[in-house]
Amino acid sequence: MEKAYRIKKNSDFQAIYRRGKSVANRQFVIYMMPDKGLTHFKLGISVSKKLGNAVTRNRIKRAIRENFKVHKDDMLPRNIIVIARHPAKDMTVLEIQKSLEHVLKVAKLFNKRIK
């Protein structure tokens, strides 16, 4: 995913945590906050060291990024932070995709109906 789609600064993460709204399921927590200047979404991913070693954490992050890449044109322009919870570490990429799509639908972050 291009740099324009990323949230990197700690201050940006903290602002979204403080002022954003959250939606969660068993595997993921989504924090979202609208931003007037955005023409597309921005994504930040957080996977705790408690979830496993670097290989496991990076696999989860890759699966999350891939899901957002697939739905890049379907997303509303928002700042989004995805936090992976413990059950996500034992899931396949397809299961991660389904779970993430579910929580994104609940958060109403799609600009059109996704099957």
Swiss-Prot record:
UniProt cross-references to InterPro entries, sorted A to Z: Ribosomal_Su5_D2-typ_SF (IPR020568), Ribsml_uS5_D2-typ_fold_subgr (IPR014721), RNase_P (IPR000100), RNase_P_CS (IPR020539)
GO MF assignments: 3'-tRNA processing endoribonuclease activity; ribonuclease P activity; tRNA binding
EC numbers on record: 3.1.26.5
GO terms classed as biological process: tRNA 5'-leader removal
Keywords for this protein: Endonuclease, Hydrolase, Nuclease, RNA-binding, tRNA processing
GO cellular component, one term: ribonuclease P complex
Domain of life from the UniProt record: Bacteria
Catalytic activity: Endonucleolytic cleavage of RNA, removing 5'-extranucleotides from tRNA precursor
PANTHER family per the UniProt record, alphabetical: RIBONUCLEASE P PROTEIN COMPONENT (PTHR33992:SF1)
Record function comment: RNaseP catalyzes the removal of the 5'-leader sequence from pre-tRNA to produce the mature 5'-terminus. It can also cleave other RNA substrates such as 4.5S RNA. The protein component plays an auxiliary but essential role in vivo by binding to the 5'-leader sequence and broadening the substrate specificity of the ribozyme.
Family stated for the protein in its record: Belongs to the RnpA family.
Subunit structure: Consists of a catalytic RNA component (M1 or rnpB) and a protein subunit.
Protein's name according to its UniProt entry: Ribonuclease P protein component
